[in-house]
Regions:
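Short aromatic-glycine-(Arg/Gly/Cys) micro-motifs in beta-strand/loop hairpins
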Residues: 11-26
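A short, exposed loop/beta-hairpin motif centered on an aromatic-Gly-Thr core
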Residues: 24-38
């Protein structure tokens, strides 16, 4: 399992902006565009790069906080 696999990633459509937005909130805000499959792949690459940066700096990885079906209070 890759370190990035522990972080929830999702794709959503923005009716307001008429674009797809992909997010990984525990690691970064997100990116947007018109091809959800390409965007998801790019997001995974960026998350891997962010994790590599954390490791190279000797910083701990962010704790995964977002989970699918997590109860919202």
């Amino acid at each position: 399992m890759k370190a990035s696999d522990q972080y929830h990633k999702w794709v959503e459509w923005s009716d307001e902006d008429h674009i797809y937005i992909v997010k990984c909130p525990d690691v970064m805000t997100g990116i947007h565009g018109d091809d959800p499959i390409r965007l998801y792949s790019e997001l995974c690459d960026v998350v891997d790069e962010v994790i590599q940066h954390f490791v190279s700096e000797g910083r701990p990885l962010p704790r995964p906080r977002i989970r699918p079906m997590q109860e919202v209070l």
